[in-house]
Amino acid sequence: MDYPEPIAKLINSYTKLPGIGPKTATRLAFYTLGMQEDDVVDFSKSLLSAKKDLTFCRICGNITENSVNPCAICQDKSRDQSTVFVVENSRDVMAMENTRDYYGLYHVLNGVISPSAGTGPEDINLPSLIRRLSDHQEINEVIVGTNANAEGEATAMYLARLLKPAGIKVTRLAHGLAVGSDIDYADQLTLIKAVQGRTEL
């Protein structure tokens, strides 16, 4: 038996989210149907507001409000202007900020190099990093914080080959992070140790 069209559309919408298969999407759809109408309206307003009121920082690529661009981190002159922490996504920035142990700048790639997925250096936020390093000679270290998987390693090695000839120190997070792990899932102590024990590429 097919679901009524409104439910089928809702299920289909949930399946577009990462990690949500048809069964979970169905559970979420029926849970949504059981919510109070006010809660559903608030939920939909939150989705629309996040999409409409947020953008990417024009300097680092992190998520920021439309009214705050560059983002608060890029505007903060008290931060160490000589170090840039390169991460895959904005969740990684939040994970590092929550450690309260890193006080430099960030650059969000919004992806990784992945030949199998057809994603090359030009498809991620890499050209802006090169421009940024060229425009800001005070930056003398790039910490590569891509995840410890094949794509993250490929991206790290590409960055090292690209930046080292320019005289920029390129370091990699220490492997207190398990191979295959994502930064935003690591606990704060592991992240602190990974930054402190970073090694040069």
From Swiss-Prot:
SUPFAM superfamilies linked to this entry: Recombination protein RecR
Protein name (Swiss-Prot/TrEMBL): Recombination protein RecR
Toprim domain ranges (all copies): 82-178
HAMAP family recorded: RecR
Zn-finger segments (C4-type): 57-74
GO biological process: DNA recombination; DNA repair
Family as reported in the entry's similarity comment: Belongs to the RecR family.
Annotated GO MF terms: DNA binding; zinc ion binding
Gene3D superfamilies per record: 3.40.1360.10, 6.10.250.240, RecR Domain 1
InterPro entries cross-referenced by the UniProt entry: DNA_Rcmb_RecR (IPR000093), Rcmb_RecR (IPR023627), Rcmb_RecR_Znf (IPR015967), TOPRIM_dom (IPR006171), TOPRIM_RecR (IPR034137)
CDD domains per UniProt: TOPRIM_recR
Pfam families attached to this UniProt entry: RecR_C (PF21175), RecR_HhH (PF21176), RecR_ZnF (PF02132), Toprim_4 (PF13662)
Keyword Acetylation found: no
Keywords, comma-separated and alphabetical: DNA damage, DNA recombination, DNA repair, Metal-binding, Zinc, Zinc-finger
